[in-house]
């Protein structure tokens, strides 16, 4: 219980020392924000929360070329479920110059996703379970975030 800090390089994942469950929080901190990375490539930067079985409990994809943030879930080897979209990516990062903070609050039946202190979505969970690992991925070195993001979990708060 308490606070755990993880450094996640692009293309890698980390196992959590304590699972994230209802009432807990995950925050991803990036020391850089590159909203010009999308020219000519799909620029799909993703942050993911995984269950023990490898299910994507929450998949957050920042797609600059399409100018959307996609939220979705899927079971291992299963299809993606019903995606939810928030448009105007750059506008969602207003407020903190040159840096990014993406916070996920686990409310039990939904995830509240806050970007730079502004709620962008209340995502109704399509798959339930404890978050036991996190990942950070980016297409071809064109992440909108820094090469390493810091993830902080706040657990046992409830």
Swiss-Prot record:
Keywords: Apoptosis, Hydrolase, Lectin, Nuclease. SUPFAM superfamilies: Concanavalin A-like lectins/glucanases. It comes from the Eukaryota. Disulfide bonds: none annotated. The modification Blocked amino end (Gln) is found at residue 1. It holds the Pfam family Gal-bind_lectin. One of its GO terms (biological process) is positive regulation of apoptotic process. Its EC number is 3.1.21.-. Residues 12-155 form the Galectin domain. Detected in the fruiting body. One of its GO terms (molecular function) is polysaccharide binding. It is an enzyme of class 3 (hydrolase). N-acetyl-alpha-neuraminyl-(2->3)-beta-D-galactosyl-(1->4)-beta-D-glucose binds at residues 43, 59, 63, 72, 74, 80, 83. The keyword Hydrolase applies. Homodimer. Anti-tumor lectin with DNase activity. Inhibits the growth of several tumor cell lines in vitro. Induces lymphocyte infiltration and necrosis of tumor cells in a mouse tumor model. Induces apoptosis in HeLa cells. Binds N-acetylneuraminyl lactose (N-acetyl-alpha-neuraminyl-(2->3)-beta-D-galactosyl-(1->4)-beta-D-glucose). This is Anti-tumor lectin.
